[in-house]
Amino acid sequence: MSGFFGVASKEDCVTELFYGVDYHSHLGTRRAGMAVYSEGKGFSRAIHNIENTPFRTKFDKDANEMNGNIGIGCISDFEPQPLLIQSHLGSFAIATVGKINNHDELVKKVYEEGTCHFQEMSGGMINATELVAALMCTKHSILAGIRYVQSLVKGSLSIMLLTSEGLYVARDRLGRTPVMIGKRDGAMCATFESFAYMNLDFEDHYELGPAEVYFFNAEEGRTIGEAGDEMKICSFLWVYYGYPTATYEGVNVEDMRCRCGEMLAKRDAGKVFPDSAAGVPDSGLAHAIGYSNYTKIPYTRPFIKYTPTWARSFMPTNQKQRNLVARMKLIPVHKMIKDRKLLLIDDSIVRGTQLRETTE
């Protein structure tokens, strides 16, 4: 998973951009980047590896040196971005969120349409964001390019694009990932996570529909590409990926998890009789709270996540490392475990990594 944030302001926007991007750190731990535009300096950009260093620490120096009124940034679990592009459409910076399943097919198509090379490689593959930019630049306008890419991509793709005039943002064709617009006096922003602008004094302004394309500057925004009718948002945003304070399509993540726990409790009524209900941190906690609230079974925390250093266990790229993180990040409270019947709720049981390591 990845996340992005963009802002246009009458004042310098780098502080808002810095913290807005940082609020997406739960969505990725490999790469991060920021790009800004100022009339005096033009485009400037910074990209860093954040696998072993948090975003704020890595980008603190860049944030103090950059300046501009418009900017975009991203946390990426795959390719380095944003990318700076010079083309017949003008100069722009671009960041994407999603997964292109027909990547190789589209690379071949770009070659056939006249592009002779790609510059960016990530893990032996052509950078997906550069691929998107190459496809866009075969058309006569940015909007036409975005629509063209949306029609070709199999998988998911949301786009954020920075120009000297303002920001373009396009939600995935089927709305699989969210895009929210925030607004305050003299500034507007776009974000994957709705809560990312709450502490920056922005207020909820608009949520893009599937395939919708939106343009904004510091003063105003407008839809330039109408939304589609079909919505297939990723349900795992509520179950796992999303931060508890996030809201997608009017449904808050924490509230949804509590209600899921309540539904589990209704299913179990009269069948199980635990001493306490508990969740595997972090995203399992609200499920357990919902279960406890409905059944009146005490909610306890027999496993505590060591939050200062351990990331979410889905983030490492190899399974061995995932297993290690899953094992090391949770510390048991034996007083709350020994001789007790626990009902333990976990949302990550595809591979059984978390639940197996925890219960053993």
Where are these regions (language model features)?
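Hydrophobic alpha-helical segments characteristic of transmembrane helices
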Residues: A246, K271-R301
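Feature captures the catalytic cores and cofactor-binding loops of soluble hydro-lyases/lyases
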Residues: D60, N64, Q86, I289, ...
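Conserved short alpha-helical segments that host acidic/polar catalytic motifs at enzyme active sites
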Residues: M1-G209, F215-D275, V280
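Generic, well-ordered alpha-helical scaffold segments in large soluble proteins
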Residues: K109, E113, L135, L152, ...
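Short, glycine/charge-rich flexible loops or terminal/linker lids adjacent to PRPP-binding catalytic cores
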Residues: K296-L343, G352-E357
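Phosphate/diphosphate-binding loops
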Residues: A196, E203, L208-E212, K266-A269, ...
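Gly/Ser/Thr-rich loops at beta-strand to alpha-helix junctions
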Residues: K99-I100, V280-H287, V350-G352
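Alpha-helix capping and helix-loop boundary segments enriched in small/acidic/polar residues
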Residues: G123, V251, D255, T317, ...
